């Protein structure tokens, strides 16, 4: 059997034997609070559309205006003919809102993170990353010529011990962690990077739009200004794409050397128009963040004290189960009550820390939150009665060790 065919077959067999096979599901209306699968309706608690913009008629109209003005696509990379007034306007809005000199646009957060690390890091550099950073950051760090070390999750003492050995490093953390919903201690991390003459880059994919004054994100909430800020448009913005916010000089550097930017077709200008409108909606429609806070408090009130419940100050509400099969079983039980929650398993999270990743949006109602919590409590009780009790206590220990 040819090498690649054999390798592919072996990897697929191994993944199936582990019970970790992933599959695409065709869903309708999945950008709203109610999705449809195979003719059945479910309350959607798996979306990253935190502010409920993805299917908002105001934002849809803005994109249609952009389509009428600019047509369907950009037709070229930014440095050829793909950079329009709509792109420039979006960059300017982001800079004025978030307090940076330059914004460089990308087609995804994954490509923005990879472009950042690949273009900045050289052979003798040191990269220090939080152990729970996104796969895009970890992969870029491992493939870069720099020496990468990981510090324990949100552990500033461990970070300082590494910085004391390797000053003038690039420190990278997320603002809000996508699988745990917790926040980085940004003020302390910023202080350490200043102390050890290092740079700080923050990926705020899950904080922008949700935290801070007028939704300006995790760094604004922590009252810090990192050297580099990555924001993505696929969560609170309700769209897709990303931007790197930085100084004018770093922006010039990325324009020359960030290959994901230089050699990719620019996002459609109509999308940039819609993103500019999303910026305005995020900053002016405070009721969306207030609604999220209200729903988060209701969820915590119902689940507080239940084993597996993890309290967070963000829309991401992980419920820790432990074993992968138990997490899948409870997720399926929830579907029988018309509640759609995704079970997250290895390799996305460490073995033994499988969880339900519950996400709240401003489009949910209090009644839907109560249906979620009632259904989850019933599913856990049935799981315990059937003898397949989730290994919640052991999973906490495994998670602690993994960090």
From Swiss-Prot:
PTM annotation (N6-(pyridoxal phosphate)lysine): residues: 235
Region (Disordered): 383-403
Pfam families the UniProt entry points to: Aminotran_1_2
UniProt feature, compositional bias: Polar residues: 385-394
Binding site residues for substrate: 22, 134, 348
Alphabetical GO biological process terms: biotin biosynthetic process
Pathway info: Cofactor biosynthesis; biotin biosynthesis
UniProt EC number: 2.3.1.47
InterPro entries: Aminotrans_II_pyridoxalP_BS, Aminotransferase_I/II_large, AON_synthase_class-II, AONS_Archaea/Proteobacteria, AONS_Proteobacteria, PyrdxlP-dep_Trfase, PyrdxlP-dep_Trfase_major, PyrdxlP-dep_Trfase_small
CDD domains reported in the protein's UniProt record: KBL_like
Cofactor annotation: pyridoxal 5'-phosphate
Enzyme class name: transferase
Keyword list, A-Z: Biotin biosynthesis, Pyridoxal phosphate, Transferase
Record family assignment: Belongs to the class-II pyridoxal-phosphate-dependent aminotransferase family. BioF subfamily.
Subunit structure of this chain's protein: Homodimer.
Protein name: 8-amino-7-oxononanoate synthase
Organism: Vibrio atlanticus (strain LGP32)
């Amino acid at each position: 059997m040819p090498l690649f065919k054999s390798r592919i077959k072996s990897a697929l067999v191994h993944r199936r034997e582990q019970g970790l096979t992933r599959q695409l599901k065709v869903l309708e209306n999945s950008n709203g609070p109610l999705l449809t699968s195979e003719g059945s309706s479910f309350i959607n608690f798996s979306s990253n559309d935190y502010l409920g913009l993805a299917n908002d008629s105001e934002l849809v109209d803005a994109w249609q205006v952009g389509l009428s003005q600019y047509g369907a696509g950009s037709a070229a990379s930014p440095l050829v003919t793909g950079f329009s007034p709509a792109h420039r306007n979006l960059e300017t809005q982001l800079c004025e809102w978030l307090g940076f000199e330059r914004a460089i646009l990308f087609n995804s957060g994954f490509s923005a993170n990879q472009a950042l690390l690949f273009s900045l890091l050289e052979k003798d550099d040191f990269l220090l990353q939080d152990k729970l950073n996104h796969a895009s950051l970890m992969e870029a760090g491992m493939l870069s010529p720099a020496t990468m070390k990981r510090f324990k999750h949100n552990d500033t003492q461990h970070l300082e011990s590494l910085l004391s050995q390797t000053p003038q490093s690039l420190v990278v953390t997320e603002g809000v962690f996508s699988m745990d919903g917790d926040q980085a201690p940004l003020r302390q991390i910023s202080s350490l990077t200043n102390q050890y003459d290092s740079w700080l880059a923050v990926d705020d994919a899950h904080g922008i739009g949700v935290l801070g004054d007028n939704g300006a994100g995790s760094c604004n909430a922590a009252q810090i200004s990192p050297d580099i800020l990555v924001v993505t448009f696929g969560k609170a913005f309700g769209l897709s794409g990303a931007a790197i916010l930085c100084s004018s000089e770093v922006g010039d550097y990325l324009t020359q050397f960030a290959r994901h930017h230089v050699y990719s077709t620019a996002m459609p200008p109509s999308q940039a128009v819609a993103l500019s409108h999303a910026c305005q909606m995020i900053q002016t429609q405070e009721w969306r963040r207030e609604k999220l806070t209200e729903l988060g408090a209701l969820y915590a009130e119902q689940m507080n004290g239940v084993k597996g419940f993890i309290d967070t100050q963000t829309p991401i509400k992980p419920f820790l189960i432990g074993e992968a099969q138990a997490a899948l079983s409870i997720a399926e039980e929830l579907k029988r009550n018309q509640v759609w929650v995704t079970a997250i398993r290895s390799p996305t999270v460490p073995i033994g820390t499988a969880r339900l990743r519950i996400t709240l949006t401003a489009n949910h109602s209090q009644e839907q939150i109560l249906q979620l919590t009632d259904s989850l409590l019933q599913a856990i009780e049935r799981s315990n009665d059937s003898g397949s009790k989730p290994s919640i206590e052991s999973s906490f220990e495994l998670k602690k060790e993994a960090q």
